[in-house]
Amino acid sequence: MAQRIFTLILLLCSTSVFAGLFDAPGRSQFVPADQAFTFDFQQNQHDLNLTWQIKDGYYLYRKQIRITPEHAKIADVQLPQGVWHEDEFYGKSEIYRDRLTLPVTINQASAGATLTVTYQGCADAGFCYPPETKTVPLSEVVANNAAPQPVSVPQQEQPTAQLPFSALWALLIGIGIAFTPCVLPMYPLISGIVLGGKQRLSTARALLLTFIYVQGMALTYTALGLVVAAAGLQFQAALQHPYVLIGLAIVFTLLAMSMFGLFTLQLPSSLQTRLTLMSNRQQGGSPGGVFVMGAIAGLICSPCTTAPLSAILLYIAQSGNMWLGGGTLYLYALGMGLPLMLITVFGNRLLPKSGPWMEQVKTAFGFVILALPVFLLERVIGDIWGLRLWSALGVAFFGGAFITSLQAKRGWMRVVQIILLAAALVSVRPLQDWAFGATHTAQTQTHLNFTQIKTVDELNQALVEAKGKPVMLDLYADWCVACKEFEKYTFSDPQVQKALADTVLLQANVTANDAQDVALLKHLNVLGLPTILFFDGQGQEHPQARVTGFMDAETFSAHLRDRQP
């Protein structure tokens, strides 16, 4: 009886399910690409459907899907919108989860025509697969003289671009714009017009009329926000193109320059005059007339409000979110209207005295607008150059504010000057590192010294030349996020470097995924990246020491102590 029980225990422990319970971290728990992304197709004359069944915990990159016809003509393929995914190294990318159905219209296909489909995906656990290529055989299709009908693409979950600033900032910006030289002096006049020249209104009545005026103005701005966000939703893919991002960055920079006084940006004077006449025809003191006056006022942009309004409109177009677009502009208008409501109720005694400080407020908003092109360019030029741009902007803002504050004579301004100077010195650090090469030197000192190999023959030769030393082979690719995490966080750790001091370090860069790369991965039986292999002094791999997926420095150091031959 005891022998039977012992045999049963051995049988259970030998199965893959129970054996998986004893796998150490880093052992492969990932399925092959064909199981992670099950690909299928179905053709019915001119209509071809490509489908991917995506395993839970995995995703496909939208930008990595490519379709190339051979001896066939197809209509333009419109990829459905995905969901946003963000990582430290590549920023935001659109991805597909669960299931993707892609309809393709075949305009004409000769006998033997094919469709080459390339795609690539990753696992949430930080494991990426090389690009997969499938060949789809096409049935013969005779060209149809009629114009092909546009392909109806099923929409997946709408992506919402994550913007770096909350919509609530629009409220603060609106309040700040109210204190610029083009707006603040006009509030007493506007208050009188809204009340219809009546001085003996109750506080509640005056507040109600002013609130209605602000809501009319807010309605105009909200409508603008909805229209721009809807347009951004239609052109969301185009708005993420590097050339478009660079163009928008230039526009934002020009808008900021107008806030610095380099030129004046406003509606044509003839249009402003016409809108003003329409507003003057309305009857002040009545709710209906006041509402129309506010709605028209939202269209009359002064030189101080045109640039911020244009910047906010272009900014929310990046989101493609109509709720965010309308809400942002509503809060912006509400912020501009709050000082007007206070003046109407409490009178001019709440207004600060006009002076040069209003120009400084206008200049400060120019720097706020300048932050937007930096945010956009960061997606194109990468994190390192993005940090340098933020550094330059910080130095310009805090340095300029410090120089301006030197004109102040009040004692408490000395504390402000010290804070501004300290902020400028902190901001300049990335530029200092770049100028004097500090960052490069540090990186050079912390990187492992890998010997690059490309082919199976080069690997075998390197194993022979190791002369009895243990060997570690790191398989790397630019499209592998976890590979970059290994490089930045794990291989730079002093404990890891010390543990690998007597190990021959090899690295194969398979970014190109060419025939040699594919042959090497197949020879090593590698499903995807990151994968790190360990060989003993005789050139034999230790499969139990193989690492798939990211390990931090502490875990990897423990793995080296326990597993490395």
Swiss-Prot record:
Presence of the UniProt keyword Coiled coil in the record: no
Broad enzyme group: oxidoreductase
Instruction: Look up the record and give one Gene Ontology term from the biological process aspect.
Output: cytochrome complex assembly
User: Which PROSITE patterns has this protein been placed in?
Assistant: THIOREDOXIN_1 (PS00194), THIOREDOXIN_2 (PS51352)
The UniProt entry, under Gene3D superfamilies, shows: Glutaredoxin (3.40.30.10), Thiol:disulfide interchange protein DsbD, N-terminal domain (2.60.40.1250)
Positions of transmembrane segments: 163-183, 208-228, 243-263, 296-316, 323-343, 365-385, 386-406
Catalysed reaction equations from the record: [protein]-dithiol + NAD(+) = [protein]-disulfide + NADH + H(+); [protein]-dithiol + NADP(+) = [protein]-disulfide + NADPH + H(+)
Q: Does the keyword Cell membrane apply?
A: yes
Question: What InterPro entries does the record point to?
Answer: Cyt_c_assmbl_TM_dom (IPR003834), DsbD_gamma (IPR035671), DsbDN (IPR028250), DsbDN_sf (IPR036929), Thiol_diS_interchange_DbsD (IPR022910), Thioredoxin-like_fold (IPR012336), Thioredoxin-like_sf (IPR036249), Thioredoxin_CS (IPR017937)
What is its biological role? Required to facilitate the formation of correct disulfide bonds in some periplasmic proteins and for the assembly of the periplasmic c-type cytochromes. Acts by transferring electrons from cytoplasmic thioredoxin to the periplasm. This transfer involves a cascade of disulfide bond formation and reduction steps.
Report the protein name in the record. Thiol:disulfide interchange protein DsbD
Q: What is the lineage of its organism?
A: Bacteria, Pseudomonadati, Pseudomonadota, Gammaproteobacteria, Enterobacterales
What is the name of the gene encoding this protein?
Answer: dsbD
